[in-house]
Amino acid sequence: MFITFEGIEGSGKSTALQGLAAWLQQRGHGVAVTREPGGSRLGRTLRSILLDLGNTDITPEAELFLYLADRAQHVAQVVRPALDEGMVVLSDRYADSTVVYQGYGRGLDPMMLRQFNDVAVGGLWPDLTILLDLEPEAGLNRALARNIREGMHAAEGRFEAESLAFHTRVREGYLTWAALHGGRYRVVDATQSPEDVVRDVVGIVAAALGDVSSGEAVSGRTGA
């Protein structure tokens, strides 16, 4: 099973993903945890370019193709091999991030981006996508505090430096895209405590796996 986590900056994707990974491992599932950009050796180099605060002059088109290169390598070297081994793959961001950030955020055509991504991933789309949703102001405050705390403000702060208007477009784009692809999307309220977010995510995945023994309520919602 291939599960991706999406959301604006500071939405808590990494925390929710790690909580889900622990739950899956406790139930005997093999789990591969990965991320974009940076899930492969080449991807780590591309991540340093894409997220560096000093690279504010990257054009939307150049940004797009750097992300596509990262993704193609990631799928070939990490995602497909793990799925072939029967593992549950959890990815912090995937192709939907490009559709939303470069499409709704930067103004490129989302449907064109979907087609480009189809080529990059060889048609491999997630079985389930969890969108962690909250207001952009709250997410940015979280993300900026995290980057400063971890000493990553310059190395990984390029998107946090974007305007509030940009992040508002991204958030609205995510909700629009989730509604268009409601069959695989579940939206979780990311304003809750981390523990409550993990509980909701576990409930969603337990239902998808048919794990009725988890005792967790499913409280995500499907896009229309």
Curated annotation (Swiss-Prot):
Signal sequence extent: none
Record-level GO BP terms: dTDP biosynthetic process; dTTP biosynthetic process; dUDP biosynthetic process
Presence of keyword Nucleotide-binding: yes
UniProt-listed Enzyme Commission number(s): 2.7.4.9
GO molecular function: ATP binding; dTMP kinase activity
Coiled coil stretches, renumbered: none
Pfam families recorded: Thymidylate_kin
This protein's GO CC annotations: cytosol
Database matches in SUPFAM superfamilies: P-loop containing nucleoside triphosphate hydrolases
Binding site for ATP: G7, I8, E9, G10, S11, G12, K13, S14
Keywords for this protein: ATP-binding, Kinase, Nucleotide biosynthesis, Nucleotide-binding, Transferase
Catalytic activity, as annotated: dTMP + ATP = dTDP + ADP
Similarity annotation: Belongs to the thymidylate kinase family.
Function: Phosphorylation of dTMP to form dTDP in both de novo and salvage pathways of dTTP synthesis.
UniProt cross-references to PANTHER family, sorted A to Z: THYMIDYLATE KINASE, UMP-CMP KINASE 2, MITOCHONDRIAL
Name of the protein described by the UniProt record: Thymidylate kinase
Provenance organism: Nitratidesulfovibrio vulgaris (strain ATCC 29579 / DSM 644 / CCUG 34227 / NCIMB 8303 / VKM B-1760 / Hildenborough)
Source species taxonomy: Bacteria, Pseudomonadati, Thermodesulfobacteriota, Desulfovibrionia, Desulfovibrionales
Gene: tmk
